[in-house]
Amino acid sequence: MAYYALVGTAGIRRSRTPRLGRPVGISPSVTAVGGVVLLLPDGEAVSGRGPSARAHAAALSLGRRLARAGHTEGLVAHVVHYRGRGWNGADAQPAADASWAVTEAVRRYGDVPICLVGHGMGARAALRAAEDPAVDAVLALAPWLPDQDVAAEPEPVRHLLGRRVLIVHGTNDARTDPELSYRLAERAKKSNRDVCRFEVHSDGHALRQYRDEVHALAADFVLGSLFARPYARPVADALAAPPPLGLRMPLAAGFGSAPGR
């Protein structure tokens, strides 16, 4: 049932129902789904507008890359359509929509491994929704995180125990502070050794400058986490290394271009 809600200064809007986009990766040769990637697009801190078409397109591009890479294992990807693009403080609607998407994926596909892949605000939603026991891995690209405030509760990380977690952040990101994602990774690593973080030097929030390398890194992590494919050496090293080495791993130009990677 639709209802009305007041969001900040954006005025009154009609809420939407979250949904999964069309599956990416399904073909006649795939007889069974072996794993699911749920892609969570970027958004805005405060907004009453609907989901961003541009952010959806960026997530869809990565979803296609991941589905192609995991075709033999029956990997399918869905881009999650939020009810709106705003986080809107304690409302945190995208995180709730991400949690709904996990439940929906389990309903559709049963007990298969699930990876949440988010960018910006979607990365924060992915990290939050990883509390669902059905989630096996989280890939957070340029996560939008709140500034640390002694008066506020820090972003939760304990629920990430038992999940593989990869954070990727451009060092020149002017929209989301890379140091905040480092601090979150540092806290998460204290209780979960399966956390690593890569820095994309000189790249910005959209991670366009090294898009091919970022997509290759994403595919390596997702397939290694969901289907036990061997990780590329840099990913394995980052997971094994203690802080700060494993949390400030540089993403090398040309990552993924070697044969077989």
Language model feature labels by segment:
Residues 4-72:
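Short, surface-exposed "cap/lid" segments of acyl-processing enzymes
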Residues 117-126:
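Gly/Ala-rich beta-loop-alpha elbow adjacent to hydrolase catalytic centers
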Residues 140-147, 203:
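Active-site nucleophile loop of the alpha/beta-hydrolase fold
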Residues 146-147, 171-177:
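Acidic catalytic loop of the alpha/beta-hydrolase fold
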Residues 153, 177-187:
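Short alpha-helix in the alpha/beta-hydrolase fold that links the catalytic acid
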Residues 160-162, 166-173:
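Short beta-strand/loop motif that positions the catalytic acidic residue
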Residues 182, 193-261:
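C-terminal catalytic histidine-bearing segment of alpha/beta-hydrolase fold enzymes
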